[in-house]
């Protein structure tokens, strides 16, 4: 992963979006585990 280029602020936005996307997927996964256990029991 290359460091963000200070002359290009768009790079920093891309990094932020990618990080928030990963956190969102992690949150969905953590929430899906107990729900799947509840539905499949």
Curated annotation (Swiss-Prot):
<dbReference type="GO" id="GO:0009539">
    <property type="term" value="C:photosystem II reaction center"/>
</dbReference>
<keyword id="KW-0604">Photosystem II</keyword>
<protein>
    <recommendedName>
        <fullName>Photosystem II reaction center protein L</fullName>
    </recommendedName>
</protein>
<keyword id="KW-1133">Transmembrane helix</keyword>
<dbReference type="InterPro" id="IPR037266">
    <property type="entry name" value="PSII_PsbL_sf"/>
</dbReference>
<feature type="transmembrane region" description="Helical">
    <location>
        <begin position="20"/>
        <end position="40"/>
    </location>
</feature>
<keyword id="KW-0602">Photosynthesis</keyword>
<dbReference type="InterPro" id="IPR003372">
    <property type="entry name" value="PSII_PsbL"/>
</dbReference>
<comment type="function">
    <text>One of the components of the core complex of photosystem II (PSII). PSII is a light-driven water:plastoquinone oxidoreductase that uses light energy to abstract electrons from H(2)O, generating O(2) and a proton gradient subsequently used for ATP formation. It consists of a core antenna complex that captures photons, and an electron transfer chain that converts photonic excitation into a charge separation. This subunit is found at the monomer-monomer interface and is required for correct PSII assembly and/or dimerization.</text>
</comment>
<keyword id="KW-0793">Thylakoid</keyword>
<keyword id="KW-0674">Reaction center</keyword>
<keyword id="KW-0934">Plastid</keyword>
<keyword id="KW-0472">Membrane</keyword>
<dbReference type="GO" id="GO:0009535">
    <property type="term" value="C:chloroplast thylakoid membrane"/>
</dbReference>
<comment type="similarity">
    <text>Belongs to the PsbL family.</text>
</comment>
<dbReference type="GO" id="GO:0015979">
    <property type="term" value="P:photosynthesis"/>
</dbReference>
<dbReference type="Pfam" id="PF02419">
    <property type="entry name" value="PsbL"/>
</dbReference>
<keyword id="KW-0150">Chloroplast</keyword>
<comment type="subunit">
    <text>PSII is composed of 1 copy each of membrane proteins PsbA, PsbB, PsbC, PsbD, PsbE, PsbF, PsbH, PsbI, PsbJ, PsbK, PsbL, PsbM, PsbT, PsbX, PsbY, PsbZ, Psb30/Ycf12, at least 3 peripheral proteins of the oxygen-evolving complex and a large number of cofactors. It forms dimeric complexes.</text>
</comment>
<keyword id="KW-0812">Transmembrane</keyword>
């Amino acid at each position: 992963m290359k460091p963000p280029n200070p002359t290009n602020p768009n790079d920093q936005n891309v990094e932020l979006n990618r990080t928030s996307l990963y956190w969102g997927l992690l949150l969905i996964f953590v929430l899906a585990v107990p729900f799947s256990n509840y539905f499949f029991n």
